[in-house]
Design a protein with these regions (language model features):
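Bacterial N-terminal signal peptides that target proteins for export
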Residues: 2-11
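Short hydrophobic "helix-edge" motifs at membrane interfaces and signal-peptide entry regions
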Residues: 12, 38-40, 257-259
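Hydrophobic membrane-targeting signal helices
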Residues: 15-20
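Sec/Tat signal peptide C-region and signal peptidase I cleavage site
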Residues: 21-26
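Short secondary-structure boundary/capping elements
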Residues: 27, 56, 245-249
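Structured, acidic catalytic/metal-binding patches in enzyme active sites
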Residues: 31, 36-238
Length: 293
């Protein structure tokens, strides 16, 4: 379980980086939404998650429990029941062709990053250099936290298992990683070095993101992420591949699942809002999407 969780947290951090690309103009201040409308015999629910969070901040409220209880199946970003998922995650995080990020860093930047990793994680780039920068960034995000990270994905998967409900995925691991891989390596590396140079500022920024998430204010959350000092550069140019295209690809999956049986959908909060977000796309198709909490 520990290895599985580490792999998932690596990917979770990557997705957190991806969320920084979009400023969501959310009209509704909520994370949980009820979906009703044409072809839906019973309501389904959407929940916006934050991929890296402390256990004390992971709140499974009564409305969430009810939504999960009313659902007959659960959809997360990935199929958590897939036994090959852990191995696939580990492989997807590795640099291609045996490359090492050491080859891509200046001597000074290498020293800064190597020292940071040794101090925070007791291992340096000799061990971590074979990871893609965006994968290493996800591990570095965990060093900013005062806890062992918890996961909404794992929690919802465990709740579903306890209730003998099937867990399915909105997309494949390959599709998710293909979107993340469109972020240039140079930008990814800059984010790593910037965080290593300014760890206190990075920790403060991350804490602010979590605090804003807990207010359920999606617009403010995405604004905070978009202004991140540690995204490595202007990520807005990759908004289409990281969020909008994925939202559009998810829509028919969501529609089909919700028509078959009441479903609880949980995915990164950044996918909920704005004109290309899941909420707007569903409303454009004639569904009623109502904020719950």
């Amino acid at each position: 379980m520990k290895k599985w969780s580490t792999s998932r947290f690596m990917l979770a951090g990557c997705l957190l980086v991806g969320l920084a690309t979009q400023l969501v103009q959310a009209q509704d201040k909520a994370l949980l939404y009820k979906v009703t409308g044409p072809g839906l015999a019973q309501p389904s629910y959407l929940y916006g998650t934050f991929h890296l969070i402390c256990p004390t901040d992971l709140q499974i409220t009564d409305p969430i429990k009810k939504a999960m209880g009313d659902a007959k199946q659960v959809y997360l970003e990935l199929d958590m029941d897939d036994p090959s998922l852990m191995m696939g995650m580990q492989k997807a995080m590795m640099m291609p062709n045996g490359k090492n990020i050491k080859e891509m860093l200046s001597p000074d930047d290498y020293t800064v990053l190597d020292n940071y990793l040794k101090k925070k994680m007791n291992m340096g780039l000799t061990q971590f250099g074979m990871l893609k920068p965006i994968g290493l960034m996800s591990l570095m995000y965990t060093t900013l936290m005062p806890c062992q990270p918890a996961s909404y994905d794992l929690t919802f998967a465990q709740m579903a298992a306890a209730e003998k409900k099937e867990v399915l995925g909105l997309e494949s691991l390959e599709a998710e990683m293909a979107a993340l891989d469109k972020v240039p390596l140079a930008d990814q590396l800059k984010g790593l070095v910037d965080m290593a140079k300014k760890p206190e500022e990075a920790q403060k920024e991350f804490t602010t993101m979590v605090d804003v998430y807990k207010t359920h204010d999606l617009s403010k959350l995405m604004s905070t992420m978009k202004s991140s000092q540690f995204a490595g550069g202007d990520m807005a140019q990759f908004e289409a591949s990281l969020l909008n295209e994925r939202n559009a690809n998810w829509l028919p999956v969501i529609e089909k699942a919700a028509k078959e049986k009441p479903t609880f959908f949980a995915f990164g909060a950044g996918h909920l809002g704005n004109e290309n977000g899941v909420i707007s796309l569903l409303r454009k198709k004639g569904y009623t999407v109502t904020p719950v909490q």
